[in-house]
Amino acid sequence: DENQPLERRYRQLRESLERVVREKIQGNSLQTTDLAARINYVATQYELDIKEQNQLHTFRLTSNDILNHRKFPAKEEFLRDLRAVAFAYRKMFAQDIPLKLFSVLPKQEITSLGKKEKKEYIRRIRVCFDYADDTYLYVHPVDIIADEPIRVVYNKPGINHEFEETIKELWRYAQLNLLDVFVDREGIYTPSFIVLEPDYLIDISSLAECYKDYGSHPANYFLSRLVPIDNARPLLLGNIANLFLDEWIHAGEEEPDYIDCMKKAFRQYPIELAACAELRDPSKEKEFAKDCRMHFEHIRDIVQHTFLEPGYNLDKKDAVLEPSYICEALGIQGRLDYMQRDMSSFIEMKSGKADEFSIQGKVEPKENNKVQMLLYMAVLEYSMGQDRRRMHPYLLYTRYPLLYPARASWAQVRRVINLRNRIVAAEYGVQFHNHSDFTRNLLAQINPEVMNERKLRGRFWEQYLKPSISRFREKLSALEPLEQAYFYTLYNFITKELYTSKSGDVDYEGRAGASALWLSTLDEKREAGEILYDLQIIENKASQVHKAYILLSIPQYDEMFLPNFRTGDVVILYERNHDSDNVTNKMVFKGNIEQITDTELRIRLRATYRNVSVFPPDSRYAVEHDTMDTTFRSMYLGL
């Protein structure tokens, strides 16, 4: 329709291509929601040459820019893209282009988007894996046009050899993020990081907990999701210590009172405290009370004295507690305990023990805690654009107390991301094969021989570490064949649902899953009613201890826009002042919709933010739906 705006015609053409490509891959083994990978797959299926493929990718990239409002549509470009799609359909459907359409198409190909100039260094690039030989990975870039696959060097000592195990797990059309890429004169890429399926976010604390005294096998991740926490006491103590930190950070002239703080703790965690089996023992209850008092005093000492010492870049007046981050670059997400608002310094707090045995007479951070710190540093670097060399990260062990300045080791970060990739590959395998035999072989790795990578021996291993691994194995082996079949089938079902909730549904029209937060264009979100934007603060009550909330005004959208939000929805709130702002480059705040009308939105925040500057009053905000992994955690535990 000539009378329709070009932008609308672009959207219709894009939807048409997405629908056709999705139909053409149905019943095939391709498991990806990414349009670039789907185009490559269909191009191979219907023998589109490299020029025809690139014309479709040119349309994909142009429509991305137009639908994200980064570019104004031009008629000449639209006709070029219409021609590319029409000629592709001609091959896919083995039918001639209707004469009415053919008559308006350009008679000759109009040159595609110009090739990007060769760069010597690329911060980050998304690619689609094709195949590998002994020297290179061969990949297709997602965001630029290339006439042939790009060669990527892997297993290079000192640069990316840590990803050797990741490479063995790759499958055709897998999505990869390549970070810190050096490009030589021949256009060969050498990345520092290879991140598999980055849209599948793994929680930082869950990843760090895979680092045990006996090794860091991916089976630790699967074991922890299937086994309930034996002793809730350390977790409770950690939560109460976080509450103490909050009180001391936001204390004015008057010091917080310990008894008042404990009353707050009982109001905040009544069921957890009442249900904790250890606290039913009077002697252990006394010990717990004593521990709480000790942590309270230690946190006071750190905040009132250590913070002020020269060399520590910490200012409690400009702190943010429990900020959340989503890092699509590395495929991870997490929440910090304490951060300076300018992101120059942050603290990860631990109420448990540090490593008291590795070096005699010296307390050192535990490996899993160091890993957690390193991942937060990497998130701030790759998501928020901070320079790791200028960061001041600290581990705070409130038990001693010890405020430990952490050092960056990017080789260790690469090893951790390799572990993340192996976990994601296993999750992909479970939902892709969806077969009991595959899952049986995967979970068979939960055994002491496989997981004891450091070959520990002696009393510590035999008495404290090995039994928890063996117990799961024994329980699973003791099941009847029918019970085992039920267990594996249900495990597959939950994992498939979890994978879909993160990466999206292959058969779903449009985008779904948590990854839609950064993969969908603004227009797609508007059309699905999945975003409220240009919100402004009416009332900021984020500092209230028990019912922290924020009241926002909803602007007048056009009448075609129908928001898909209701009371009780779990949401993400973030600053959105530019079209480029999204959940992967902004601090995010999680909460629930408490009340919504046509003009106002009230969000109950999950955490209290007493620093008013966290929510600048002149800023504009956006709200989108959030997904919660905790639901799946309880499903796995139900097994």
Predicted regions mapped to residue ranges:
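Amphipathic alpha-helical interface elements
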Residues: 1-101
